[in-house]
Amino acid sequence: MFFKKNKKKETSSMANGEDTKKLDKKELIDEAENLINTIDSVSGDERIKVLNRIGSLYFEADKIDDAIKYYEISISENKSLGKAYTELVKLYNIKRKEAISKKDDESMKHYIEKIDSLLQLSKDVIRGRV
């Protein structure tokens, strides 16, 4: 009576057999490339949104280096904490872990320094120095 589990109702899409699958890697990369072609035609906050979207698409497609590139551009143009900042921390940690597994000390140090610079940026933003 009190601890009965509620049964979830099937949504209409599940009942129809439709899958709400993610886009495959090729579609993600194609969408990112289409957005890259529009970067020069936008400016300000819209440009930052496009750069972040490109980074996000590449991240979903497991193109880590490309994702890092566009998030870094976004951060360099708009020094604020947000999606680009949090995603870059994740990406740098992924690259750092890869370097550790390959026993590549130089790459590991490089990504630790990148993470440190992001932490410094966050301190500067919070203190109003940027």
Predicted feature descriptions by range:
Residues N37-S41, I75-S76, H110, S117-Q120, ...:
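Conserved structural position within tetratricopeptide repeats
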